[in-house]
């Protein structure tokens, strides 16, 4: 009788660190202030990511106030800023980035404004699923489901609304990276 009572009374009443329905991925394993990383392919710099803080979750890293620089041929082709960012570390999205909250991109050929933006590293293109605005000089182009190369030389969108001025647009622009879906 005493043994049964001891087993019953000695049960732990501590709450586990993560709730049973919470995935292991959601529980951060490391948090850093002033985070910085870069991605290279065959020794060639492709992008850099700098943020105020980062939280490592196993297959991805959350970043607060990220700044991303995307490089082509060793030169910055676009600089992106947002409120939140995510770097994917494995799987089909490996080395890709997801930015949310007041995303602003600046390239030599214009500016980009949206709420959600994906840098699809393998394809070498930007994708904004929701409304995006591209500004070149006085020209403004608004649409959804934007696909673009990082210099904004080539942009494709649906549900277009625009005010375009010839002085801001170059005829027959073509970029070496296709923007069509894979």
Identify the role of each PLM range.
Residues 1-182:
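Mature-chain termini and adjacent capping regions
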């Amino acid at each position: 009788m005493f043994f049964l009572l001891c087993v019953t009374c000695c049960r732990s009443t501590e709450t586990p660190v993560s709730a049973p329905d919470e995935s292991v991925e959601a529980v951060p394993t490391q948090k850093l202030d002033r985070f910085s990383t870069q991605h290279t392919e065959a020794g060639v710099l492709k992008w850099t990511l700098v943020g105020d803080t980062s939280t490592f979750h196993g297959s991805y890293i959350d970043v607060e106030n990220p700044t991303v620089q995307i490089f082509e041929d060793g030169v910055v082709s676009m600089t992106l800023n947002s409120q939140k960012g995510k770097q994917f570390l494995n799987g089909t999205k490996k080395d890709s980035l997801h930015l949310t909250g007041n995303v602003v991109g600046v390239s030599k050929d214009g500016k980009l404004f949206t709420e959600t933006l994906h840098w699809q590293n393998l394809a070498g293109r930007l994708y904004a699923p929701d409304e995006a605005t591209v500004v070149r000089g006085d020209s403004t182009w608004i649409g959804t489901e934007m696909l673009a190369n990082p210099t904004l030389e080539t942009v494709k969108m649906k549900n277009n609304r625009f005010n375009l001025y010839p002085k801001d647009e170059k005829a027959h622009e073509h970029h070496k990276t296709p923007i069509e879906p894979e």
